[in-house]
């Protein structure tokens, strides 16, 4: 079911936003693009913080429609927003910040604040001023406040931009658990392909203010318009996590071409934990001098980057059988 239907245009100085896409009413959608592509501007349009030409629809409701001069205020849209910097009320406690949204939610839809606090593991912080909280605690309070408002759709703008390593991975798991527990459709803004793959079942790709691709993540990851947004080192595909051993949680893994080795005979007695048989669909020379091999497997398309010598030595041509070897450590 389509929940979010957008055809929005906006001019800001020399920048032009022209975004047309739909997002499903379930799952998590990643809004992906390089820095400066217009992701935060589009998020502001969806939230009602900026006016646009065109329309924004949420289910059967029109949130904005320039043709009928309609522009619903942010608090009437049923959309929750979590910004990079949390934007909590600094003079209030964590509990009061959460209660602010809770009081404005439809009475029948209001969750129990204590239950929400337990879910986000902030019970001990509820009565502390938010100025005394750590960055991670503030992020969890911001998520709790968003959930307490009982939105129909949640927007998150680079929610882990300030996190790295274990804290980043832990926060991704919190978002996945939040989506599963509250059945809350979400759109997450990110420029990191690994984060997008771990979180999202669908993808909207934005470049220079224009949506260049949208749809199921695995499908979009194979589209040339999307591939052009990636650096050479990020070239790869979204592989559903259920197809790979040693992967825990998440929607998919972004499997880079450099992480995949190829063999033309079935490997035996090897340390690689994931071996997938397939057929070579295409062999493409890259400007960097490498060769990109597209392998079709029962689990989906896989890309591997090899040298021209390897292509010649292994006899890699379209139609030949090959085995993809994926080491455990990149997973």
Model feature map: region roles:
Residues 129-133, 137:
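Conserved ABC ATPase signature
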Residues 238, 243-284, 301, 305-331:
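Glycine/charge-rich catalytic "coupling/switch" loops of P-loop NTPases
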Residues 61-65, 110-125, 176-177:
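Conserved ABC ATPase "signature" region
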Residues 176, 180, 190-248, 257-258:
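Internal alpha/beta loop-helix hairpins
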Residues 148-152:
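A short, proline-enriched helix->beta-strand linker immediately N-terminal to the Walker B motif
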Residues 154-158:
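Catalytic Walker B motif of ABC-type/P-loop ATPase nucleotide-binding domains
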Residues 63-80, 104:
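ABC ATPase NBD coupling module
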């Amino acid at each position: 079911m389509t929940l979010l239907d957008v055809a929005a245009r906006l001019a800001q100085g020399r920048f032009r936003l022209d975004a047309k896409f739909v997002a499903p009413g379930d799952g998590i959608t990643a809004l992906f693009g390089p820095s400066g592509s217009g992701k935060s501007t589009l998020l502001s349009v969806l939230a009602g913080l900026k006016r646009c030409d065109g329309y924004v629809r949420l289910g059967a409701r029109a949130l904005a429609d320039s043709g009928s001069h309609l522009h619903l205020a942010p608090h009437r849209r049923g959309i929750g927003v979590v910004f990079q910097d949390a934007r909590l009320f600094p003079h209030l406690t964590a509990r009061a910040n959460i209660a602010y949204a809770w009081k404005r939610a439809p009475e029948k839809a209001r969750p129990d604040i204590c239950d929400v606090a337990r879910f986000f593991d902030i019970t001990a912080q509820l009565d502390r001023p938010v100025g005394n909280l750590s960055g991670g605690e503030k992020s969890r309070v911001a998520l709790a406040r968003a959930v307490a408002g009982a939105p129909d759709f949640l927007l998150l703008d680079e929610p882990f931009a300030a996190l790295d390593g274990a804290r980043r991975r832990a926060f991704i798991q919190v978002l996945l658990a939040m989506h599963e527990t509250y059945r809350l459709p979400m759109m997450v803004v990110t420029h990191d392909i690994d984060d997008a793959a771990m979180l999202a079942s669908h993808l909207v790709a934005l470049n220079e203010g224009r949506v260049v691709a949208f749809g199921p993540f695995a499908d979009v990851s194979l589209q040339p318009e999307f591939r052009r947004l990636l650096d050479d080192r990020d070239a790869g595909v979204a592989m559903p996590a259920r197809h790979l051993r040693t992967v825990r949680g998440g929607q998919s893994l972004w499997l880079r071409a450099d992480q995949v080795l190829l063999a033309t005979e079935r490997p035996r007695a090897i340390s690689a934990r994931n071996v997938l048989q397939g057929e070579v669909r295409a062999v493409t020379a890259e400007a960097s001098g490498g060769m990109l091999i597209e392998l079709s497997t029962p689990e989906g398309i896989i890309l591997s980057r090899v040298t021209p010598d390897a292509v010649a030595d292994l006899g890699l041509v379209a139609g030949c059988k090959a085995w993809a070897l994926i080491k455990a450590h990149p997973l």
